[in-house]
Design a protein with these regions (language model features):
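ABC ATPase nucleotide-binding domains
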Residues: 2-4, 8-155
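C-terminal boundary and immediately downstream tail of ABC-type ATPase nucleotide-binding domains
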Residues: 150-179, 205, 275
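Glycine-centered loop/turn positions within well-structured domains
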Residues: 121, 145, 154, 166, ...
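Residues that scaffold the ATP/ADP-binding catalytic core of kinase and kinase-like folds
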Residues: 90, 97, 159, 214, ...
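Non-catalytic connector elements of ABC transporters
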Residues: 173-286
Length: 286
């Protein structure tokens, strides 16, 4: 399929104006100057570069240079646009703005965008579907919600979001629950149709925001279908929208808990209970 590409670097011709950069591909196709000018003007309006046709690349901001590169690729009207980490050279806020812009552009032009990135937030915000690729192999694909909330693969669970990973051994199981030994402690999870056997080595994952910190409590709550283990607060960090707690478990593993608000009367070195719903844990056999 005819494909255009947007590179990691801006890759603009420094001796050409914005208009000349965007229209260069059409010029190579021997399109008439009047047609090129009309198409470039429309494309500049589409990507938010109106009035900048005579500017040189060094006179543009990083975001404007990236828009020029996008316009130069889109004006060829190919079936697919391949974007190779296109926002990596931009600062954090500009990346967020460009994610919104890319989403809008894709809906407007209606072609397939293949966006390559290592940035999770970038992928989640621009994609209709996400493919996780490692060592040349596609491990899984799905909607952003599916990939984040229900990863099928241990690598995906570690890579997407802030999840805690536990390695352990299946102690027992029935049609409802599974008990896994993680070393000096056991974790009970909901059996969601997993095909497992006793003494099997498995991995568990749980999102850091799915764990609740409770002080001075050490009992399971069967009525609410929750379970918990004990730990010690090793670090408390304020990160703006949430507070991150690091909790040291008896097996020596340190896990993250993200809370939208401060847990009252909790300080460093306090003994706490970590509480979760049984269904919040996912089991991975690879």
């Amino acid at each position: 399929r005819p494909t255009s590409m947007v590179f990691q670097g801006f890759a603009l011709f420094p001796h050409m104006s914005v208009l000349e950069n965007i229209g260069y591909g059409l010029k190579l196709k021997s399109i008439e100057k009047e047609v090129i000018f009309t198409k470039v003007t429309k494309m500049m309006d589409l990507v938010g570069l109106t009035g900048l046709s005579k500017r040189m690349p060094h006179e543009l901001s990083g975001g404007q240079q990236q828009r020029v590169q996008l316009a130069r690729a889109l004006i060829l009207e190919n079936d697919v646009l391949l974007l190779d980490e296109p926002l990596s050279a931009l600062d954090a806020q500009l990346r967020k703005d460009m994610c919104i812009e890319l989403k809008r552009l894709q809906k407007t032009v209606g072609i397939t965008f293949v966006h390559v990135t290592h940035n999770q937030e970038e992928a989640m915000s621009v994609a209709d579907r996400i493919a996780i690729i490692a060592d040349g192999e596609m491990l899984e694909e799905g909607t952003p919600e599916e990939i984040y909330s229900n990863p099928k693969n241990k690598f995906t669970a570690e890579f997407i979001g802030e999840k805690n990973i536990f390695n352990g051994t299946v102690v027992s199981f029935n049609t409802k629950n599974i008990t896994i030994d993680i070393g000096n402690d056991t974790i009970e999870i909901l059996n969601q149709g997993y095909k497992i056997k006793k003494n099997q080595k498995v991995s568990l994952s749980i999102k850091s925001e799915s764990i609740e910190i409770i002080k001075n409590q050490n009992k399971s709550d069967d009525k609410l279908k929750v379970a918990q283990i004990m730990g010690t607060i090793s670090e408390i960090t304020f990160l703006g929208q949430f507070i991150r707690y690091l909790v040291l478990l008896k097996n020596g593993q340190e896990i993250q808990v993200r809370s939208p608000k401060e847990v009252k009367n909790i300080k460093l070195n306090d003994k706490v209970s970590l509480k979760w719903k049984l269904e919040d844990f996912l089991l991975h056999q690879k």
